[in-house]
């Protein structure tokens, strides 16, 4: 075989290989590919590749798809995901997630279609190692010289950086332990990559990433050296425990520094309840939006229910919540079929170098799948693309080591210009769908800049453009409503309040799971009721405000603000009993919410119950004394009545 390091890269690659390499190299470069710009670029590259494949095939009157047993479970999973759009409460977001899944399948197709030789497999291995070396070196530099508490490379989350580096490290280790043909330069490169990437995993200080890394290198060692490799695992674990290192220090400190650090058990229990409540799933991407009804308390925090689990911190549970038991089963089926295909590839008589490549690729897949049990790694495009790349390369390697290339599945379609036009329209529609959120984000960002300069009219114009670009975005609607309220405060023109209420009503219709728009709508109705021009509608507006707060409570039952505002309305109407009930419900969830306790004390005084009033006042003093000297967030200040609750 040609030397792994020094083989010459040809002057040109096929278009699919260039697209695969471009996506792989670019994906982690901007915060792991999670923000709007990199997501858009990745999507457009993949859509361009899809369009090219379709047009080329239609011009030849044949669409060819590489054979693999994985297509049926992939198509089944995608089909179920598409079907879930029917019952998703927030279709716009679910549609974007479905597009992501579809393009991951396109990426898989591109790899199987383009990687048709051992040299190309090796070049992509080199790309993975080079990216790991670059990211690892950057992360180590950040930690040692730039004052970062945790290495993170170009990722926004050190945990995801840890996964990326662990994949690179186990691939390099597997090639070292199995390889015999790489020469001195090749071995030095692999040793350097393994060392840099392993060090980066430690400096990232990710508990889940470290566990996944140890699991993977144990598997690699066991396959290569048998049970004796378990001794190496024991040495690594003991070294981590006995000798000072950043990972050990974080494991010791994290519980005292972050009251939310050990809440994963509660989050998983919460996710299990969601699956029980919605066995068919709630829709793609809906986990965080349904979190308002599934908050859980953190007793040591001022705001007990202040945190919402926006992810399950276990991707398999999250799949079950969003796509139901059936969706999770289809995803597990993909893993099982892939595993069966790898078993068919593995043979004791495989060349040792091929064994090293196959084991390294499978270990990289294992890293991501194991880390997915404790973190949200499937939400990071760079990690998912790397997972798909390694999984597909392992399948492609199987075709090479068998010595035969299975004939692709061909679909004959007589050439017709209309088919090409329809394909272009379909790909163009997907591109439009991909561009929508990025365009809205860009336009809204311009609006934010104008708002920061107090140019609210320009800000409104930018947000209106954003609402045209992406009509399904509730964030844009909410931003518009806030700007309209700001314009009302400046001008006193009550028509701005009417426009704000209209935008929030649209937001509620787009996403009925979010408890914030109905609460804000209620506060706007109260502002409208205060305007002289609407004096004759005051009772009606107050009733609408009360209904809005009730809607807020039904969607977000753990937030005290809806109860507080509703209680004030009841109290204003003289209904002290109802007011007392909702104030007491507020403090039953949030005992540190002083505004509700103050209201209860005042109600007790009005009812001639001084002992009850004194009890509430004493509780208020105790709460303030307990948290005296704390650095308070804006929300905590509202709870402790340092500042008034905001609308």
Where are these regions (language model features)?
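Hydrophobic alpha-helical transmembrane segments
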Residues: 78-85, 110-113, 119-148, 156, ...
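C-terminal luminal/periplasmic domains and tails of membrane-associated envelope-modifying transferases
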Residues: 443-647
């Amino acid at each position: 075989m040609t030397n792994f390091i020094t083989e010459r890269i040809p002057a040109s690659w096929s278009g699919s290989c260039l697209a695969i390499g471009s996506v792989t190299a670019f994906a982690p470069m901007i915060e792991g590919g999670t923000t709007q710009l990199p997501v858009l670029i990745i999507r457009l590259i993949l859509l361009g590749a899809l369009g090219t494949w379709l047009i080329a095939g239609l011009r030849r009157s044949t669409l060819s798809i590489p054979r693999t047993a994985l297509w049926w479970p992939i198509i089944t999973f995608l089909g179920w995901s598409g079907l879930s759009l029917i019952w998703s409460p927030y279709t716009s977001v679910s549609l974007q997630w479905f597009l992501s899944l579809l393009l991951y399948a396109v990426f898989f197709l591109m790899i199987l279609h383009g990687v048709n030789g051992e040299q190309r497999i090796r070049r992509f291995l080199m790309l993975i190692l080079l990216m790991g070396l670059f990211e690892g070196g950057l992360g180590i530099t950040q930690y040692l010289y730039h004052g970062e508490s945790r290495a993170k490379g170009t990722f926004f989350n050190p945990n995801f950086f840890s996964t990326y580096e662990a994949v690179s490290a186990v691939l390099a280790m597997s090639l070292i332990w199995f390889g015999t043909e790489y020469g001195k330069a090749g071995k030095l490169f692999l040793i350097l990559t393994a060392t840099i990437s392993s060090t980066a995993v430690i400096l990232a200080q990710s508990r889940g990433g470290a566990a996944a890394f140890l699991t993977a290198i144990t598997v690699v060692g066991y396959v290569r050296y048998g049970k004796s490799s378990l001794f190496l695992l024991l040495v690594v674990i003991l070294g981590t425990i006995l000798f000072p290192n950043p990972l050990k220090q974080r494991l010791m400190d994290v519980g005292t520094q972050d009251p939310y650090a050990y809440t994963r058990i509660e989050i998983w229990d919460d996710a299990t309840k969601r699956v029980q409540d919605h066995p068919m799933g709630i829709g793609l991407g809906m986990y965080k939006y349904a979190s308002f009804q599934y908050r859980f308390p953190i007793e040591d925090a001022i705001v007990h229910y202040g945190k919402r689990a926006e992810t399950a911190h276990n991707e398999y549970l999250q799949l079950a919540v969003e796509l139901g038991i059936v969706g999770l089963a289809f995803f597990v089926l993909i893993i099982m079929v892939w595993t069966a295909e790898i078993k068919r590839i593995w043979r004791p008589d495989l060349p040792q170098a091929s064994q090293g490549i196959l084991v390294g690729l499978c270990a990289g897949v294992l890293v991501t799948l194991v880390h997915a049990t404790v973190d949200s790694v499937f939400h990071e495009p760079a990690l998912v693309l790397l997972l798909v790349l390694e999984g597909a390369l392992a399948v492609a390697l199987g075709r090479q080591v068998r010595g035969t290339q299975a004939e692709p599945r061909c679909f004959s379609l007589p050439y017709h210009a209309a088919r090409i036009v329809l394909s272009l329209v379909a790909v163009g529609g997907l591109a439009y769908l991909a561009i929508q959120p990025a365009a809205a984000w860009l336009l809204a960002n311009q609006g934010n800049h104008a708002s920061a300069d107090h140019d609210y009219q320009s800000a409104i114009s930018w947000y209106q453009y954003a609402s045209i670009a992406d009509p399904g975005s509730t964030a844009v609607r909410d931003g518009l409503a806030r700007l309209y309220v700001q314009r009302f405060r400046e001008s006193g023109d009550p028509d701005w309040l009417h426009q704000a209420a209209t935008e929030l009503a649209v937001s509620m219709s787009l996403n009925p799971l979010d408890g914030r728009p109905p609460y804000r709508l209620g506060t706007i109705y109260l502002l409208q009721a205060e305007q002289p021009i609407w004096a004759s509608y005051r009772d009606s507006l107050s009733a609408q405000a009360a209904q809005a707060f009730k809607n807020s409570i039904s969607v977000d039952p753990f937030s005290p603000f809806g109860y507080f505002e509703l209680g004030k309305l009841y109290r204003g109407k003289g209904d002290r009993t109802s007011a007392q009930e909702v104030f007491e419900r507020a403090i039953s969830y949030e005992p540190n919410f002083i505004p509700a306790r103050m209201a209860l004390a005042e109600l007790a005084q009005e009812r001639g119950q001084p002992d009850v009033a004194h009890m509430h006042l004493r509780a208020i003093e105790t709460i303030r004394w307990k948290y005296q000297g704390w650095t308070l967030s804006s929300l905590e200040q509202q709870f402790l009545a340092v500042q008034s609750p905001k609308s």
